[in-house]
């Protein structure tokens, strides 16, 4: 299993550290050649408008959409914004991998960053207490079927899954708790097994 981490901008190295601690091989993705080797992709936090502009100028945007048809993608914070179907109050045209509408920086600016324990339900009836770090985090304003809500904060979704894609408005890579990354790895394994059949 080889997990790609989009490395155009943002905190991609923290995802690498988390996956390496779990014994998972990773590759920084900046070109099509690197993407072609990957079984899945993580889109990290960072500056969503800068990341989208770089995706467009490197011709990676359409390649990512095609990649995501058959392979899992996990986006955190800015990565969630890029994976959404609509960004409120923005001209950005996101990837459309998750049937959600988001609002950038809606949890506050950099000075308003905070950490809070949230209940995460990665399996039915199995509650995990997870330390969620919100840094200029987006809010998920609307979600549509078949989006599954795996965690909420103050009544709003903050961790969602749609098919073989996962998105978080917070930063699980900044904790020492690997639960959400392990969940994504299980999604990747399941996807690999399904494509062997």
Curated annotation (Swiss-Prot):
Pfam families: SNO. The keyword Hydrolase applies. GO terms for cellular component: cytosol; glutaminase complex. The keyword GTP-binding does not apply. Pathway: Cofactor biosynthesis; pyridoxal 5'-phosphate biosynthesis. It catalyses: aldehydo-D-ribose 5-phosphate + D-glyceraldehyde 3-phosphate + L-glutamine = pyridoxal 5'-phosphate + L-glutamate + phosphate + 3 H2O + H(+); L-glutamine + H2O = L-glutamate + NH4(+). The active site is at residues 77, 171, 173. L-glutamine binds at residues 46-48, 104, 135-136. One of its GO terms (biological process) is pyridoxal phosphate biosynthetic process. Keywords: Glutamine amidotransferase, Hydrolase, Lyase, Pyridoxal phosphate. PANTHER family: PYRIDOXAL 5'-PHOSPHATE SYNTHASE SUBUNIT SNO, PYRIDOXAL 5'-PHOSPHATE SYNTHASE SUBUNIT SNO1-RELATED. Catalyzes the hydrolysis of glutamine to glutamate and ammonia as part of the biosynthesis of pyridoxal 5'-phosphate. The resulting ammonia molecule is channeled to the active site of PdxS. Belongs to the glutaminase PdxT/SNO family. HAMAP family: PdxT. This is Pyridoxal 5'-phosphate synthase subunit PdxT. It comes from Protochlamydia amoebophila (strain UWE25).
